[in-house]
Amino acid sequence: TTGCQIIIADGLKGSDEVEVPVVGGEYVKNAKIGRAVMDADVFISLTHFKGHEEAGFGGCLKNIGMGCGSRAGKMEQHNAGKPHVAQKHCIGCGQCRKICAHGAPIITDGKAVIDHDRCVGCGRCIAVCPKDAVRIDWDETTTNLNCKIAEYTKAVVDGRPCFHISLVIDVSPNCDCHSENDMAIVPNVGM
């Protein structure tokens, strides 16, 4: 181990974020970045390459853009919209309403409905629903996803001192956010 402290950039609940303007952003106007990332005086990234089911592969740009996004930022990059409630599965328990800091879920006629004008896309309602009735459209295109990742990366590094190290070792075919790891798809190259 390095002996370095671990700091969860967007806080323990994923809600400690800063909205960073993306100058010239076509897909993202304000990136939702973990506050600790933007509070740092210098940004140093140590990343490794891996395959990625949606982006094609993940390296420095993908790891910074997606990795530094807050919970809501990750949601914004991965999806093409805000959550909705599958009415036939909703039991009207109100758990989504209780967890939402913005009051977006409203219970109407015993069922939840999400007010998209109030919703910030954090996804907490999705995680708390006992019937998986709160859903998101995950059908973002690869091109749109990669453009959003690039714009999020720009928000993190633009106008500040940065240093990046990329490693080509143990390159797995899929994103390493999965608990399992597969055989490397290329030989180890190093830095």
What are these regions (language model features)?
Residues T1-M191:
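Extended, low-polarity segments enriched in aliphatic/aromatic residues
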